[in-house]
Amino acid sequence: MKVSANSDIRVVELFAGVGGFRVGLERCSERFKTIWANQWEPGQAGQWAYKCYSKNFGEDSHCVNADIATVINQVPPHDLLVGGFPCQDYSVASTGAKGIEGKKGVLWWSIYQIIQKNHPNYVLLENVDRLLKSPASQRGRDFGIILKCLQEEGYGIEWRVINAADYGCVQRRRRTFIFAFKNTTKQYERMTSCFSADAKDGRVLSLIHISEPTRLLSIS
């Protein structure tokens, strides 16, 4: 599946909340078109996040209010998969946190099934910085599993921990962002081309471009 330079980029948004990923992508470029989204909060009769999402984006929200595990086969072909999957089970502050084996931690496997079914060109995921060390009993296991799953499906991966406070937010909020790209993309070609003399000399290219933190910018 190839995306031409001028065509729309079909986006699927999982664990959509009130639409944070969608807003960010649409502000970035009109090419990003969310064609399907999912938001479901177990045990919450009000489903307020889903209602807020639907109100914000109207009839074109394309948001399904159902358990993600029950609608995997409904996810249409897409170019970019995004999602901020639940973070509660990745807390290393609690020795009882089960990480990827926890009640909400297992939702990673729904993401993985969707990737296996559709193989989008790009995947962008977000979670707490503690994901890197989860679970407390076996530090780094969960993050390693996620990276290995993506690698086995033919993806190259980059990741970053970004603090929202560095970009004008009034609170410290450190989040892990995982960017995966299929081995058929130009991004993958760029990554693999780094494993040459440049890589040996420490000049490996980064595919994730991050603006300078707000606190480092001069005020005009």
Label the predicted regions:
Residues 140-157:
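Conserved Class I S-adenosyl-L-methionine
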Residues 170-188:
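Conserved beta strand-loop-helix elements of the APE1-like EEP
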Residues 82, 159-161, 177-179:
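Conserved hydrophobic/aromatic beta-strand scaffold that supports enzyme active sites
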Residues 2-122, 128-143:
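Core alpha/beta nucleotide-donor-binding catalytic domains of modification enzymes
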Residues 208-220:
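Single conserved hydrophobic/aromatic residue that forms the stacking wall/gate
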Residues 73-75, 168-171:
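Short glycine-biased active-site loop of nucleotidyltransferases that positions the nucleotide triphosphate
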Residues 65, 155-166:
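Conserved S-adenosyl-L-methionine
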Residues 146, 158, 172-176:
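Residues that flank catalytic or metal-binding motifs in active/ligand-binding sites
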